[in-house]
């Protein structure tokens, strides 16, 4: 046990935290983790929080925060313009192709930080607000699919065609 504690104390932050998709070694394994082997709605659950919108990115962990990305629809769906002449796409059954593209609501592309101990939202920042130009999503797809990444000083969030955003961790209160 003393050897394990010593190894954790000597590990760098990059080794101790989950700063990228699939963790420090990109293997999905937390070498210094001690996760529960059993859980349910009431057992080994510290907190549970509802996240607005949809995001399929893997959360990352650094220090006392968990970071995640989400895309939140806001307002009413907007007609989608066609690529040629900027005209409104013809009405259709929704999935694109010759019948037209479905209308899509404005989305807020959000970076969130959640306190690891309490589950409270520490902060959230709207990276961008825009109507997505991709009208088609797979059933499990989202507009926030790429995982954030951090080097401990900066947090990087990639929202595909909506941009790459860099945040100063110190300025964000990390």
Q: What are these model-predicted stretches?
A:
Residues 7-174:
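Noncatalytic, solvent-exposed loop/strand surfaces
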Residues 1-6:
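Bacterial N-terminal signal peptides
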